C-alpha cells in the first residue's frame, strides 16, 4: 500500500463553523423596548425564529382572572405587521402563545403590538407593548460524503452519498426538486431520507466506474425552496484499479479525527501504522469503515 503522509501539523486544525444564516445579507433591526415593561413582561419572542414558530409573551406574574385553556383567547391581543392570521392561547398561568394558521414567510421581519391593557389595568404609556422578530431567510448547503462501492463484489457499481441541509424547515418534495445528477449526460436516480425538516440525506445511485476516469455532475436549483441560487458540482470517478485518496475531512464532534476517503474499500484488518502518518505526531489510532480510514490523534487539538 502506498504511504500517505498528512502534511499538516496539529496547528492546522481550525474549527470552521458554517452558519447557513450567514449566507444571507438579512439583518434584523431590533426595536427598542421601554424598560418599564420589565415589571410586567418577563420574556417575549424576539430575534431570528423559524417560520414554523409560534409567538409568545410571558408575564412576570400569573394572570389574576380565570383562564380557559380549552379555547382561544377572545380578546384581540396581537396586531402584526405584516398581518398574521391565527389565534392566541393561554399556555400556562402567565404565558400567552399566538399560533399562526399557516407557516410564516421566510426572511420576513414582523412588527408586533401586544395589547397589555386588555389583561390588566396599566398606565397609558404602557398599554401597548411593541416588539419585533424576523424569520430565517431560507437557504441551503450541500455536503457530499464521497463516492463508495455499492456492491463489494463489483467495483464498477458506485454511489454518491451526501446531505442537503436547509436553514429553515423545508417541504420534503421541494427539497427533492433541488437536486439532479448526471453521468455522461444521463440523469441518475436520487433517493432520499428526510431526517427532519432541516437535514435531508441523499444517495445518487447507478454510477458506473469505468476503465478510464469519468465524472458525475450534481446540479442544484433552489427555486422550489424559494432560494435564488443555482450551482453545479462535479465529482471525479477514478478509473478501475486506480487506488487513491479522493477526499479528506477533519471531524471535531463528538470526537476529533481525520477522515480519509479512498477510491476503494479497505480491509477492516488492514495494518495502517507507518502507512498513514501525521508530521510530528505519534501514537495514532485507526479505524476502517468501508472506503474511510479514521485517524485519531492521541490528544485533542484546539
Region locations from a protein language model:
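Bacterial N-terminal signal peptides that target proteins for export
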Residues: 2-12
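Bacterial N-terminal signal peptides
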Residues: 10-21
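Intrinsic disorder/low-complexity signature
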Residues: 1-2, 296
